[in-house]
Amino acid sequence: MSQVLTTYETPVLPEWVDYNGHLRDAFYLLVFSYATDALMAHIGLDSQNRDASGHSLFTLECHLNFLHEVKEGARVEVRTQLLGHDRKRLHIHHALYLPGSGQALALSEQMLLHVSLDGPRSAPFEGEVLARVEALAEAHRALPVPEGVGRVIGLPPVR
């Protein structure tokens, strides 16, 4: 499976649109958040497993890039790639597209932390979840790193 995952699809709802007639910035994050939920289910951290294991993922950092306008009613999909992982963290990349399109509309690079909810405190991946993370990492290993990953926001220093 050397391809990104399609993790979420939705139409752009009227209540998500701002006064400029396009998707409000906060709702890009909502769509990407739902895609993260689907990724969690894919690796075995769905609601049933979260309740049984007492483990979940928390978002540590999120970078959003808005590339093209998205209008009300447009059907969009999120494609997700696991860029890397360690014992407790996932580094992921979400990209928003029109289905069947090769042009990204928005990007979200995120760092997620695996946690034990009884603290909450960080916790290493274990068992089936670890096996699924490792399988996904292996499947995505040959994929190219998306453009803009690791980008830093800022202006040149004033001299």
Curated annotation (Swiss-Prot):
Gene source species: Pseudomonas aeruginosa (strain ATCC 15692 / DSM 22644 / CIP 104116 / JCM 14847 / LMG 12228 / 1C / PRS 101 / PAO1)
Record-given protein name: Betainyl-CoA thioesterase
One MF annotation (Gene Ontology) recorded for this entry: fatty acyl-CoA hydrolase activity
Gene3D superfamilies: Hotdog Thioesterase
Keyword Hydrolase: yes
Enzyme class: hydrolase
Pathway it works in: Amine and polyamine metabolism; carnitine metabolism
Keyword Hydrolase annotated: yes
Designated gene of the protein: cdhB
InterPro entries: 4-hydroxybenzoyl-CoA_TE, HotDog_dom_sf
Disulfide bonds: none
